[in-house]
């Protein structure tokens, strides 16, 4: 029956993976904020901002 206990330990490892996924989700939200900043760059008539390559395609 000792073998059965070892299998249970593997299941516990899966629980740890769930915690890691939650952390990654938070990071993804930060990336979305960057997209919003890009839109604002295009709307702004700042030559300095355009040089950054934020709205390079829109300049054409």
Swiss-Prot record:
Sequence repeats lie at residues 38-42, 51-55. It comes from the Bacteria. GO terms for molecular function: metal ion binding. Residues 38-55 are annotated as: 2 X 5 AA repeats of E-E-G-C-C. Residues 1-60 are annotated as: Disordered. Residues 10-35 have a biased composition (Basic residues). Keywords: Metal-binding, Nickel, Repeat, Zinc. InterPro entries: Hpn-like. The keyword Iron-sulfur does not apply. Residues 36-60 have a biased composition (Basic and acidic residues). Strongly binds nickel and zinc. Binds other metals less strongly: cobalt > copper > cadmium > manganese. May act to increase, or at least to preserve, urease activity. Exact function is still unknown. This is Histidine-rich metal-binding polypeptide. The gene is hpn.
